[in-house]
Amino acid sequence: MIPIKRSSRRWKKKGRMRWKWYKKRLRRLKRERKRARS
């Protein structure tokens, strides 16, 4: 089996990238909602 430490390190990097992308997406969605209201 692959050591957990190695895989967790990999996941941390992926998680950080996903988090940044997720935040960007959330911001975009909020802007679109405001535009739709007005």
From Swiss-Prot:
Assigned GO CC terms: ribonucleoprotein complex; ribosome
Keyword Ribosomal protein: yes
Top-rank taxon, per record: Archaea
Keyword field: Ribonucleoprotein, Ribosomal protein
UniProt keyword Secreted present: no
Note from the entry: Initially thought to be part of the large ribosomal subunit. Crystal structures show eS32/eL41 to be a small ribosomal subunit forming a bridge at the interface of the 2 subunits.
Similarity comment: family membership: Belongs to the eukaryotic ribosomal protein eS32 family.
Subunit structure: Component of the small ribosomal subunit (SSU).
Protein name: Small ribosomal subunit protein eS32
Gene: rpl41e
